């Protein structure tokens, strides 16, 4: 899967702080379709490190409860692209952000034969912004694989501690 890169530059310090997972999409919906699906994660916070890596604080359902995890995304030569070791070795890349309201990112597992892509729309607040959601949908259409959308914004589905 080759994904078009839309962000040339990334100011890592500006993505720091609280975020909320507003929508998720995946090339294989089984990665997201249940509470315990492997990539059904709720981003809480992004923390740039002094080495320009990115610590991702997320929540995920485990053993019937919501558990917090931290994942380190290691910088690569490409400004908006990181390597992570979550579930398997994957790449994370930022598709688009305005830093203040929204951030779109995708996680790609490039290991054949199970190549898969999962993307999320993050927002600084829990208010749904239809313009941002439309922009996320347009961004998904630029991807080389068909993405199935899931909106986990209903409170009972959000993994809250």
UniProtKB/Swiss-Prot annotation:
Q: In which tissues is it expressed?
A: Synthesized in mammary gland and secreted in milk.
The UniProt entry, under InterPro entries, shows: Blactoglobulin, Calycin, Lipocalin, Lipocalin_CS, Lipocln_cytosolic_FA-bd_dom
Q: Which GO terms describe its cellular component?
A: extracellular region
Recorded hits in Pfam families, A to Z, give: Lipocalin
- SUPFAM superfamilies recorded for this chain? Lipocalins
Q: Which CDD domains match?
A: lipocalin_beta-LG-like (cd19416)
Q: What is this protein called?
A: Beta-lactoglobulin-1
One GO MF annotation is: retinol binding
Write the record's keywords in alphabetical order, separated by commas.
Disulfide bond, Milk protein, Retinol-binding, Secreted, Transport
User: How is the quaternary structure described?
Assistant: Monomer.
Q: List the disulfide bonds.
A: 66-159, 106-119
Q: What is its main location?
A: secreted
Q: Which family does it belong to?
A: Belongs to the calycin superfamily. Lipocalin family.
Where does the record say this protein resides?
Answer: Secreted
- What's its job? Primary component of whey, it binds retinol and is probably involved in the transport of that molecule.
